Amino acid sequence: MTLTKQTCAKQACDCCRIRRVKCDGKRPCSSCLQNSLDCTYLQPSRKRGPKSIRLRSLKRIAEVQRESGPNTIATAPVIYKRVPKKLIDQCLRLYHDNLYVIWPLLSYDDLHKLLEEKYNDNYVYWFLTALSAATLSDLQTEIKSEEEVTFTGKQLSNLCISSCQQFDDLDNSNIFNIMTYYCLHRSFAQISNARTSYRLCCEAVGLITVAGLHREETYGSLTFEEQQLRRKLYYLLLMTERYYAIYLHCATSLDATIAPPQLELVTDPQLSMDSFLEMIRVFTVPGKCFFDALAADSTDASCTEESLKKIWNELHTTSSEIEPWSNGYIDISFSRHWIRILAWKLAYQMRGSNFSLNANNGQIPIEIARDMLIDTYLTPENLYDVHGPGVPVKTLEIATALVDIVGQYDHNMKLEAWNVLHDVCKFAFSLNHYNNDMLKRFSTKCQNALITLPISKPLQLDGYPKDNEDIDP
């Protein structure tokens, strides 16, 4: 009897519960007597504390987080479900077949081994998921799981970041974390989110420094395979940082103080390092001072006439070892023309320089533009998108230089420049553009120079949501 009274004393009557007032648990309670209410205890007592989450609710939460936009990144998910192995493996194969030659990290065999043996290791899983996201984003494609669920690069990026936030803050400087940041940077650059992309790049560069990979002596105790991977990653980040320096006007921190990766004897042409090593040469011939001068919009004291001559002479041609009109060749070709035109612009600021790359030599932009057009004639259009915003941005840089100088030509040279500019613009506007502001600035510059753009329809950007400073190497 005593137990029954204690149990009743802990339960509020129906009226007090609805009115949200204190109940003494008596039958009838004093509150009901005072207000002439019929005191009953018909509703069952509810368990105190937070309610348990039903499976249906968990599934719905996961669906919403997968479908949401970039804002989802800042919120940790309620549940954690790994991307299926088979789906990741499909992405790894796509990476090997299309992208390794452009940004080489690990071969398919090495990646597949990691997937099979260390799938449950969080750091390895995050890297493989980020690599899959970057692959789908670079190729602008999507992939379906066995359950017919479609995944895009954006969705995989969000899943990867959500998982990282749930289990770790990514402060660890192990090689997988650095590669995860690099791959996420590529994915977000492709979906036109330059600020997030640049922040992720900075995180990777910071971890490179924390791990001591900017010092050659750090590599001495590593195996050849470990050295190769870290050297490749170091130079991928160095090139990325130098690209951002120009368009986000930020100083660089990495320098070519580390030996590049060595050539490897391979039978699979997709694993050739030739084009990557040539790309490293293209980005390191100018030197750190060149990019810092462009970032500051001023001439650096260490950026001399001799260094600009070196850029012009050494980047005039590309290595004969590179297969023409391949993915690797396209990356090298446009980067080479782009850096040469930037060197010419820097010389333009250094008026009075008396050497072959003289600012008064108006033929130089025409020559660079012609070289670029030759490289475009036999290149399939679908190969440009693999490189993201890099190709259209570099093309617009060359076109802008022509617009800047066309008014200074005599009649004959002006006619020649206009014809070349017409062809360059026609090619530039055939590409998918990610940088809204740069495209508008170029169009305005042409209008101010009374130049009619050779396009038959209004300017349109591709289908992605735009960030005003969307760029990518």
UniProtKB/Swiss-Prot annotation:
Gene Ontology CC: nucleus
UniProt cross-references to Gene3D superfamilies, sorted A to Z: Zn(2)-C6 fungal-type DNA-binding domain
PROSITE patterns attached to this UniProt entry: ZN2_CY6_FUNGAL_1, ZN2_CY6_FUNGAL_2
Pfam families xref list: Fungal_trans, Zn_clus
Sequence motif: Nuclear localization signal, positions: 46-54
DNA-binding segment(s): 13-39
Keyword terms: Activator, DNA-binding, Maltose metabolism, Metal-binding, Nucleus, Transcription, Transcription regulation, Zinc
Signal peptide: none
GO molecular function: DNA binding; DNA-binding transcription factor activity, RNA polymerase II-specific; zinc ion binding
Chief location of this protein within or outside the cell: nucleus
The protein's role, per its UniProt record: Regulates the coordinate transcription of structural MAL1S (maltase) and AGT1 (maltose permease) genes.
PANTHER family for this protein: GLUCOSE TRANSPORT TRANSCRIPTION REGULATOR RGT1-RELATED-RELATED, MALTOSE FERMENTATION REGULATORY PROTEIN MAL13-RELATED
Family membership: Belongs to the MAL13 family.
This protein's name: Maltose fermentation regulatory protein MAL13
Taxonomy of the source species: Eukaryota, Fungi, Dikarya, Ascomycota, Saccharomycotina
Protein encoded by which gene: MAL13
